[in-house]
Every structure is written in C-alpha cells, then in structure tokens.
Amino acid sequence: MTQFKDKTLLVTGAAGKFGRLAVAELLARGATRIVAGTRDPAGLADVAAQGVEVRRLDFDDAASLGSGFAGVDRALIISTVAANRTEQQRAAVAAAKAAGVGYLAYTSAPYARPNADAGGIADHYWTEQAIAAAGLDFTLLRNHIYADMTLQGAGPALTSGQLFDATDGGGRNYVTRADTARTAAGALLSATGRDIVDVTGPAPVTQEQLAALYTKLTGKTVTRVGLTGDQMQAGLEAAGLPAFYAALLVAFDRDAAAGYHAVTTDAVERYSGRKPQALADFLEENKAALAQ
C-alpha cells in the first residue's frame, strides 16, 4: 500500500486541518520525499522540521503554481473554500499537467454534478472534469460529510432541544476528517489508474438517530424536526444566515433526501488500512466537546 513512497508527493493546502493530517499520515507511512504546499510557508515550520519540503503554493498566483508543482510525481489537491475555487482548482490542475505530474488525488464531494440544484457541489464537478480532461491518472475522493461537523451542529440542537433538517429521513454516512485524510494519503501512496471513490463511514445515520445520540451522550433531550426545503430555507434566513448560504445547506439536505449521502464503501479501509470510525464512537470519544 506504499508503492510510491519514494516518489515526490505534494500535498496542497498543507497548513489546513486536512492537509496537516495528510502530511502526518505520509510521514507515518514512510514517504521519503514529501512536499507541503501552502500560501504561508512560515506557518509550516514545524512540518519542515520533520524533513518535509515546504513550498509557497497559492492557487491565485500562477508563478507559485509553476514552482510549487515542479518536480512533483504525484499530488493531492485539497479543495479550497474560496468563492472562485473552480477557477483556482482548474489552474492547479493545469499547472500540475504542465509540470509533468503523473497522478492527482482530489478531495471532492458525493454525487458531484453541474445541476443548478447542486449548490456548491457543482464546483467539484467542474474540477473533476478538468482533472479527467488533463489526461493524468487520478483518484477523485468524494468525501462524505465529516463526523466532526456534528460537534459544531450540536450546540443549537442541545440549546433548543430540536434538530431541524430537510432530509426526509435520508441517512448520511458520516466519516471523520482524520479517516478521509488518511485515505487521501493512502491513495497518494498507492492508487493507480483512474477512479472515482466515495469515502464514507461504516453505515448511514439519519438525523433522528443523530438526535438520539445527542440525547444519550448529554442527557439533554433532543428531538428531530423534519421540515420541507422551503421551511428550512426560511428558518435559516430568519436565524440570520445569508440566503445564498442557506440555499447551500438546503441543497445538502435535499441530496441526503435523495439518497446520495447513504452510500457505503470500503475506501477508508482500502487506502488507510483501518476501518472507518463510526459516528457513535466519534461522538463518545469527543463527548466533552458536546458539553461546551
């Protein structure tokens, strides 16, 4: 599972949570030529001290893309959160191809598609298309929703005693950020050919089940309240969210209702060598965070 450990392996966005986890996994698995790309190399001094080459790499700076990808054999492109991320990521793919990179892994999202109702997922679709058109080998890692996000969403639910959603009872296959980062590192170390992979937890979890987990772990009763998409949109806007951001969240719930988030695969175990952590175990492990 580490046949490419002696190739030059680049991780973009290496100063972020995902990037740091991916670099740490590459180090743990014996990679010998790791390049960590970041807009601010000074922020990765601790990583450089571990023998990792740190390069300035800014998706909005063509010059840094050229030097950042130079001499790289295989690269992990971690999707950005910028409003212009489609353009950013297309530029990164073009730079990788121009530099002679032979393989790209990319952190995408479930059922990436160009439809108007796809919300921010359309950005992932167009990046996937750019990667496919580049003629390189690739693994498109369609990461499902992070289990970590349920810690952030717990506060309002525990305060109000209600967990609102428009999923129509559809499940989500929550996967931890750590598991997805280990999976991405494993793909960088071992994947060949061209593949699209859903990266999931061990089983889908409905919002009703999530509410029950919150209740069990905190002793505070949380009840799931199902809404229509329009009701969810109105409620989010009333809570102060901008309309465009509320629409993204509603689109995400709509995808869960359609079953797009209920897929289960062995990708985590295949590329990391570990079984994915279940949401219940993750929340139990982080129970203290629910009390904050």
Kindly give the residue locations of the regions a language model identified.
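Short acidic/histidine-rich motifs immediately flanking catalytic phosphotransfer sites
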Residues: 70-76
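Basic/polar N-terminal segments that are highly enriched at the extreme N-terminus
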Residues: 1-6, 288-292
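Short glycine-/small-residue-rich Rossmann-like dinucleotide-binding loops
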Residues: 58-59, 79-80, 287
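Short loop/helix-cap segments at secondary-structure boundaries that form the rim of catalytic
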Residues: 43-50, 67
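Structural recognition of the beta-strand scaffold that forms the well-ordered cores
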Residues: 76-77, 106
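Oxidoreductase cofactor-interface core, primarily capturing Rossmann-like NAD(P)-dependent enzymes
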Residues: 2-35, 39-42, 60-63, 70, ...
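A hydrophobic C-terminal alpha-helical subdomain
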Residues: 230-292
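Rossmann-fold cofactor-recognition segment
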Residues: 48-61
